[in-house]
Amino acid sequence: MAGKYLIEPDSEFIKVINQEGGDSLKKCFQCATCSVVCPISPDNKPFPRKEMIAASWGLKDRLVTSHDIWLCHQCGDCSTLCPRGAKPGDVLAAIRAYAIREYATPKFFGELINDPKKLPVLFIIPTIIFIVLGLVTGLLNFKPGGDEIVHSHFFSTWLVDLIFIPLAGWVVAIFALGLKRFIGDIHENALSSGKTKKEKIDPAGFVQALVKIIPTILKHDKFTECTENRERSTSHMMVLYSFIGLFIVTNIFFVVLYVFGIHGPYSQLNPVKWLANIAGVALVIGSAMMIKDRISKTDQVSSYKDWYLLGLVFGLGVTGLTTEMTRLADAAFLSYTFYFIHLIFVFNLFAFLPFSKLAHLVYRTVALTYDEYSERDKKEPAV
């Protein structure tokens, strides 16, 4: 006798998915074309057909705890070839956005970031923190003066680190709490659905899987397997490597400042400065390409979350480069102003990272790692 499964539809979940870009959900009649044409779907329990079925039934828990929603790169192959005009890629993107909110705490920040009416608040918060903390500590000087433009004379590096080091700890803590639940949930889901035979997660084996999957992420191999939006890999790689480059630059100059006591501004002939400038330009160009791609792809859904992130990344790059260019042009007021605005963008990017679409960098990496670790498509040896 077949086992029984009690279906408990979540109508509110269906409503949210429709609002966030998955409004084509009801067009699906489960023909499985999407799973067949998807070039990156696994052989064992392929997606996205089963996700479309579960979403139409409002099976929130089954979807949010599945790592398969993160394996999708929203390339658009399935949406283009769907005979009914459904868009599985957009539906899975909406489910991922929902999952990010589920795993990030406190929920208040998730609601704040996802509400376009509260966008000004996201910029007011760091502005108030900078001014109040800067004036209280005396590390913010609105009249730096001097013959040379030195941003640390206006906004002290001590103030920067006083704000951003605890902020980094905050982000790591939120991700740690979310990932602990996330890994446990996707493993339980994989076991119950037959996607893995490993009863427990071996930390050493998981780390080995992570090391193995990193080259795939850095080369964007999954993007290049797609047909419809293969060109997206270029802009995504530009932004990814820009962030990696800027991360390296930040850490090098941190050591240079606090270990060797060498203060900026640094020479344009400095190789590290070259890396910073190249990464900054690539960030602007890459994010601009993403914006252009979003505008041109009228058949694909772009939500407020997409535009918020793209605007944030583009603004981050533009204000950073403008800060430097106005300094070189000896325009003190403009340079200090753009530097302050740039720090607001940096604050937004990091403080709200666990709650924004950018969190997919972390969750997708872990999901890809788990998929590698689970040996999902491993063939049993012939007897």
Where do the model's predicted regions map?
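N-terminal signal-anchor module of multipass membrane proteins
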Residues: 2-30
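Membrane-anchoring/interfacial helices and their immediately flanking loops
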Residues: 45-50, 54-74, 81-83, 89-90, ...
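Active-site-adjacent structural elements in folded domains
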Residues: 16-23, 65, 225-226, 331-333
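Cysteine-centered iron-sulfur cluster-binding motifs in ferredoxin-type domains/subunits
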Residues: 22-42, 66-86, 95
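Non-heme iron-sulfur electron-transfer modules
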Residues: 1-12, 41-70, 85-110
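Membrane-embedded alpha-helical bundles of multi-pass integral membrane proteins
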Residues: 103-383
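Short, well-ordered alpha-helical packing segments
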Residues: 52, 69, 76-79, 92, ...
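Secondary-structure capping and boundary motifs in well-ordered enzyme cores
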Residues: 27-30, 64-67, 71-74, 277-280, ...
